[in-house]
């Protein structure tokens, strides 16, 4: 009995007992359900994995989700070879997480300096929210959304750390455990207000990455896949999407203003005066203590930042490799040569990278068990008059459950097969391509598992500090989800066809412009 108790204490560590039992039940019943009905077992596994993400603040999803994925491979729901194929297919994302996030860590001195100035000068919360949302949207149109979120997380961690040290009775330079609130007594209410303030900024920025990412060829990984199948370059892709994306960008800005003014769904909390005072004092102290060497370091980081933007905007190398150059340049010219100091930069990204590989295992199960097959068949067999609506709706729903890159890849391949077989016209294929791209990018803000950037935010070290749980992310994203989904749907149905014809008439796009090449597999 003593050993059983010890085993249960070790199993999933400090997680609640009910959570441990729930995961144990999942592991016991899954093989039996798979033996009885593989299709049901596949959907159950997806639901269980989403449950582990929803409980991320109770237990990091890597361990429970990893055990579920490991069991799925063991009982034959998918194969190790297929999991490896999914990992290789997403190798660019893996490189990005390994190196780019670590690279941003070494630029946090510049980021904290710049954003502290921004925060202190813009006193209006509404203006600040719009600044975060639109800046994230602009950057995500040219950079990767994960990179943008990594920057925002680094900034938020810096702000939180500065105030937490002072609220705990320390000074700016004191070492402090920012996860421990035990020393905070009088300032607890202010800290909660500051957490709400940071939560709202983080969510505005996260949604901003989706608003900007959908607009351009390089904004999201699935955009490249869709553009390759349709034969669109950077300019044509932008104009093809513009009838939908410009409307959703405007509606996103209006939503940002509305939720802040009406204080809806957890938005509207202003920066507490006490916190502003602490940050202002920190900024003054930082300026006074800054040596010539420190200013040179900031200058180096500015030049590396310029290289980062140019490298990503012009695709001079893969995102991950550009991230590696950022690590090399910042550490070399800022004098960071200690192995342990370099190693700390990877602490944020590697747990999430491991979780993402587990997620690819679940995607492999979805493919092998044909979980989306009935939906795909339904959409492709529908009449042309409702096809665009169905493509948009089902891409949106499935992207909120699964990974939007995977959903977009499956649907664009099926649509290309239908085109090759003569089931749909070239013009209809082009309309469908826009519906797939906007459908996977916009409604997927509904849940953290829809977009890798959202999932990264949920599982980052800032989320437990500011109490940003899965449920709270869904709740705070709700106004954006409703508005973007509806506006996107109406734009696809009523604005897209007419605007596409007008854009073709004025020579901004070519129609149809589709290379009749063989369809690649996923």
Swiss-Prot record:
Function, in words: Na(+)/H(+) antiporter that extrudes sodium in exchange for external protons.
Catalysis performed (reactions): 2 Na(+)(in) + 3 H(+)(out) = 2 Na(+)(out) + 3 H(+)(in)
Record's keyword terms, sorted: Antiport, Cell inner membrane, Cell membrane, Ion transport, Membrane, Sodium, Sodium transport, Transmembrane, Transmembrane helix, Transport
Compartments reported by the entry: Cell inner membrane
GO cellular component: plasma membrane
Main location: membrane
InterPro entries: Na+/H+_antiporter_NhaB
Bilayer topology term: Multi-pass membrane protein
Name of the featured protein: Na(+)/H(+) antiporter NhaB
Record family assignment: Belongs to the NhaB Na(+)/H(+) (TC 2.A.34) antiporter family.
Membrane-crossing segments per the record: 25-45, 49-69, 87-107, 128-162, 201-221, 237-257, 302-322, 356-376, 388-408, 446-466, 476-496
Gene name linked to the record: nhaB
Record-linked NCBIfam families: NhaB, PRK09547.1
GO molecular function (one): sodium:proton antiporter activity
């Amino acid at each position: 009995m003593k050993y059983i108790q010890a085993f249960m204490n070790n199993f999933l560590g400090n997680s609640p007992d009910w959570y441990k039992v729930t995961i144990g039940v999942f592991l016991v019943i899954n093989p039996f359900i798979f033996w009885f009905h593989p299709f049901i077992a596949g959907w159950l596994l997806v639901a269980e994995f989403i449950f582990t993400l929803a409980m991320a603040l109770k237990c990091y999803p890597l361990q429970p989700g990893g055990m579920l994925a490991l069991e799925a491979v063991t009982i034959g729901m998918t194969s190790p070879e297929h999991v490896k194929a999914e990992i290789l297919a997403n190798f660019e994302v893996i490189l990005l997480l390994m190196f780019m996030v670590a690279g941003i860590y070494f630029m946090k001195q510049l980021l904290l300096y710049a954003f502290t100035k921004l925060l202190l000068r813009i006193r209006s919360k509404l203006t600040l929210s719009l600044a975060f949302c639109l800046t994230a949207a602009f950057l995500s149109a040219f950079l990767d959304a994960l990179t943008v979120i990594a920057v925002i997380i680094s900034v938020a961690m810096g702000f939180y750390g500065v105030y937490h040290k002072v609220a705990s009775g320390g000074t700016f330079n004191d070492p402090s455990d920012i996860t421990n609130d035990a020393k905070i007594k009088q300032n607890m209410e202010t800290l909660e207000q500051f957490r709400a303030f940071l939560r709202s900024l983080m969510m505005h920025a996260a949604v901003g990455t989706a608003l900007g990412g959908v607009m351009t060829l390089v904004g999201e990984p699935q955009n490249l896949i869709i553009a390759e199948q349709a034969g669109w370059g950077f300019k044509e892709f932008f104009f093809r999407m513009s009838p939908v994306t410009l409307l959703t960008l405007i509606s996103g800005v209006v939503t940002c203003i509305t939720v802040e003014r009406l204080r809806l769904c957890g938005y509207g909390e202003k920066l507490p005066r006490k916190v502003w005072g602490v940050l202002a004092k920190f900024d003054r102290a930082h300026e006074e203590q800054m040596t010539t060497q420190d200013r040179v370091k900031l200058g180096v980081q500015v030049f590396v930042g310029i290289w980062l933007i140019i490298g990503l905007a012009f695709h001079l190398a893969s995102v991950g490799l550009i991230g590696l150059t950022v690590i090399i340049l910042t550490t070399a010219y800022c004098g960071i040569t200690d192995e342990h100091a370099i190693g700390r930069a990877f602490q944020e990204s590697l747990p999430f990278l491991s979780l993402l590989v587990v997620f690819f295992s679940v995607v492999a199960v979805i493919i092998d068990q044909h979980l989306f097959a009935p939906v795909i068949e339904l959409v492709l067999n529908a009449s042309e008059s409702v096809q665009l609506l169905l493509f948009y709706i089902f891409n949106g729903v499935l992207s909120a459950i699964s990974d939007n890159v995977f959903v977009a890849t499956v649907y664009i391949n099926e649509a290309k097969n239908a085109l090759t077989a003569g089931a749909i016209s070239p013009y209809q294929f082009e309309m469908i391509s826009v519906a797939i791209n906007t459908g996977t990018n916009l409604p997927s803000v509904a849940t953290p598992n829809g977009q890798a950037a959202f999932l990264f935010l949920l599982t980052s070290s800032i989320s437990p500090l500011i109490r940003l749980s899965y449920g709270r992310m869904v709740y705070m994203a709700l106004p954006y989800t409703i508005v973007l989904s509806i506006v996107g749907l109406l734009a696809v149905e009523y604005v897209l066809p007419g605007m596409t014809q007008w854009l073709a008439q004025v020579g901004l796009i070519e129609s149809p412009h589709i290379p009749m090449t063989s369809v690649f597999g996923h």
